[in-house]
């Protein structure tokens, strides 16, 4: 809920939708907690829904922007590039994306090839940014925090 709330605060004219799968190992996080946090921040332009990133329950091109922060590496047995494509499916033409995760080759495969494939499909300004080289942390911090492979993929559909 924190990313949704931060986006809502920074974009008060828009409606922010936060998607999560609560329960099981994430039992301490739930929809009502997200809603309470939004209320505490006096943010009204949010909506929190339970969902599955593997198959998003939204029509194609539903959103102006999509974001995710350290989520997909937690989804076991899922093809991470397929998860990214499912996320991009719900992004409107002209919409922007920023997805931050542990994008090591063992988890995500060849992300440089993925970036090139997106560009071939017409996506613009696509960049894969290594966030362990001073953007958010140093390489030493990334190793210590077990965040090797941390990267941000951004672009425009």
What does each model-found stretch correspond to?
Residues 24, 98-120:
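Conserved class I S-adenosyl-L-methionine
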Residues 119-124, 135-157:
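Core SAM-dependent methyltransferase catalytic element
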Residues 81-93:
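A short glycine-rich, Lys/Arg-flanked "PGG" loop and its adjoining helix->strand segment in the class I
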Residues 2-12:
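Conserved SAM-binding loop of SAM-dependent methyltransferases across substrates and taxa
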Residues 11, 75-77, 91-93:
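Helix-to-beta-strand junctions that scaffold the AdoMet/dcAdoMet cofactor pocket
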Residues 42-53:
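Conserved SAM-binding strand-loop segment of SAM-dependent methyltransferases
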Residues 51-66:
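A short acidic, Gly/Pro-enriched loop at the edge of an enzyme's catalytic core
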Residues 17-18, 94-101:
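Conserved beta-strand signature within the Rossmann-like core of class I S-adenosyl-L-methionine
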